[in-house]
């Protein structure tokens, strides 16, 4: 099941998502910008997003806990997020990943196209992906 995160999910999210400050995570939850994948009563993954240039949904984090990977849960989260963005009137979405071939293949398989590369000193290349949303997808 895919659902919006609630304030009750914050302790679980904070224990697993170390890439965002707790206060920012709480704000994103309150804005409906965090989705939870759940199996039974157990959260097994999440998708967190914000806006790029204040006008394009950008997926900042997609993570599925190890025992639940390769079961289509990531695809379900992304599909739900894209549907939500489409319903809100957005024409496109974006995301990025470090130069990890498996993650690149995942996004390309979902229809994302390479849009650029971010190079930071001492960091792996970050590949930016873009996807046009259609009314029927």
Model-derived segments and their meaning:
Residues 4-60, 65, 78-79, 84, ...:
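Acetyl-CoA-dependent GNAT
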Residues 31, 55, 101, 121-125:
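Short acidic/glycine-enriched loop/turn segments that link adjacent beta-strands
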Residues 62-69, 98:
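A short, internal acetyl-CoA/4′-phosphopantetheine-binding micro-motif in the GNAT/acyltransferase core
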Residues 70-83, 108-109:
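Conserved acetyl-CoA-binding loop-helix of GNAT-fold acetyltransferases
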Residues 85-98:
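Conserved GNAT acetyl-CoA-binding A-motif
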Residues 94-96, 113-128:
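Conserved catalytic-core motifs of GNAT/GCN5-like acyltransferases
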Residues 103, 110:
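Helix-turn-helix
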């Amino acid at each position: 099941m895919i659902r919006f995160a609630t304030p009750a999910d914050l302790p679980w999210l904070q224990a697993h998502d170390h890439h965002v400050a707790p206060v920012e995570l709480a704000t994103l939850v309150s804005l409906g910008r965090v989705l939870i994948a759940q199996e039974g009563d157990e959260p097994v993954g999440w998708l967190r997003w914000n806006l790029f240039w204040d006008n394009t949904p950008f997926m900042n984090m997609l993570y599925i806990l190890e025992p639940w990977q390769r079961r289509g849960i990531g695809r379900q989260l992304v599909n739900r997020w894209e549907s939500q963005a489409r319903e809100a009137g957005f024409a496109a979405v974006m995301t990025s990943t470090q130069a990890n071939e498996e993650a690149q293949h995942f996004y390309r398989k979902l229809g994302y196209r390479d849009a650029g590369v971010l190079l930071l000193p001492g960091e792996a290349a970050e590949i930016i992906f873009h996807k046009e949303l259609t009314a029927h997808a």
